[in-house]
Amino acid sequence: MRLHHVQVACPPGGEDAVRAFYADTLGLVEVDKPEPLRGRGGAWFRAHDATGEVVAELHVGVEDPFVPARKAHPAFVVDDEAALDRVVSRLRDAGHDAVDTERFTFPGYVRVHTVDPHGNRVELLAPSG
């Protein structure tokens, strides 16, 4: 068994903001939703490793009423601390906070937390050492 995707939500009309955040800022690749699901709104994204293999998929669905996920969250692993620092720089350049007060609290990784434009928590990790 393996994980196929994680889903978070956005409010109606929030797709452009999630595209800017997950694709432009974090570097995920938007993929087309299957035709039968397109009418629901939202957006789907994939993360790839250095070989091009899909290693994570994030689905953003529309919810009304919308409540952001403050505790439950996707956690994306980047290659190394330098890559994490580059993502943090892109986040901050785009006006997003990147909180690193728990940077050294997860054994084997360094990490930061941020929130997407709709308040959903997102974790970014890199192998330490």
Predicted features by range, described:
Residues E35-R38, D64-F66, R103-P107:
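A short beta-turn/loop motif at secondary-structure boundaries
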Residues G61-P65, P127-G129:
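Acetyl-CoA-dependent GNAT
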Residues A9-V55:
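Core segments of cupin and vicinal oxygen chelate
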Residues A20-D24, V87-R92:
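Short amphipathic alpha-helices in soluble, non-transmembrane regions
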Residues T51-L58, G119-R121:
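Short, charged/polar, Gly/Pro-enriched secondary-structure boundary elements
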